[in-house]
Amino acid sequence: MTVPVFYSISDDFTKYAAVSLNSLVKHANPETDYTVYFLNQDLSGQHKQDLSDLGIQNVHVKFFHIDDDIAKLYNTELGNNLFGACTDSSIQYVAKMVKYIKDVLALDPKKYINSGMLVMNSKAFRDEHFINHFMNLLERYHFDCIAPDQDYLNEIGEGRILHLDPRWDAMPNENTKPLKNPGLIDYNLFFKPWHFKNVQYEDYFWQSAKETKFYNELKAELNNYTDAERADDREKLNHMLLKEDKTEQDPNNWTRVKEREAVKL
């Protein structure tokens, strides 16, 4: 069995991808074969080599922080579900976001998933023409969304999402205690350990970073990131949430469209 793994990165994200790939290699089952594909447009030759050098005999590099053998995740039985994902724990204590999910998306916030990590039922996507359905919705309504890809996936997949153990998409959240055994860490939105100190789960990132050639560069990036830049990141999050007021009044928001036609597959 070969487990395919896909990354989508630009050249400037190489150092972060290298930390993740190194962690994957360290936790890979030696009895399983893995092929890691990097989807890219502008990776330099040197960075391709840097990533290739991290491969081992059973992890081949072909161009959400991984702390377990992801073959366990890949082997999830999806049944008739379109994809498997974890509930988005990062929004449960954000009142504006909870209101947006209830009033604009007409979904249950406790079932709203994070799209940063998906186990996809590719056959169902093809057989049921998921992409055609998505493009039809996009072209007809172009919904104004706070989290575009995530909102579309939640809406189209409603009722056919397998909710996975939260350890497979552990997200830093100052309102909750960290999971004791995270399998995959998603440094969601703006609070990255290479920009902010004391980020939940940061130890996993730096432990893996030390084993790559980018450790000193990443540390320098953290130390050079200014308080003004951190304040700007926080303001970007607040700006995102302002969309809730606007979209609630939109005559073609998800709630109103769903009253007229089927959105989910």
Question: At which residue positions do the language-model features occur?
Answer:
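A glycosyltransferase accessory/donor-loop signature
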Residues: 1-9, 13-19, 114-115, 120-265
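Residue-level recognition of the N-termini of beta-strands and the immediately preceding loop/turn
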Residues: 3, 32-36, 61
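A short acidic (Asp/Glu
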Residues: 16-19, 46-50, 69-70, 95-96, ...
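Active-site-proximal specificity loops/subdomain of glycosyltransferases
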Residues: 40-67, 72
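A recurrent flexible, glycine/aromatic-enriched loop bordering the glycosyltransferase active site
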Residues: 105-117
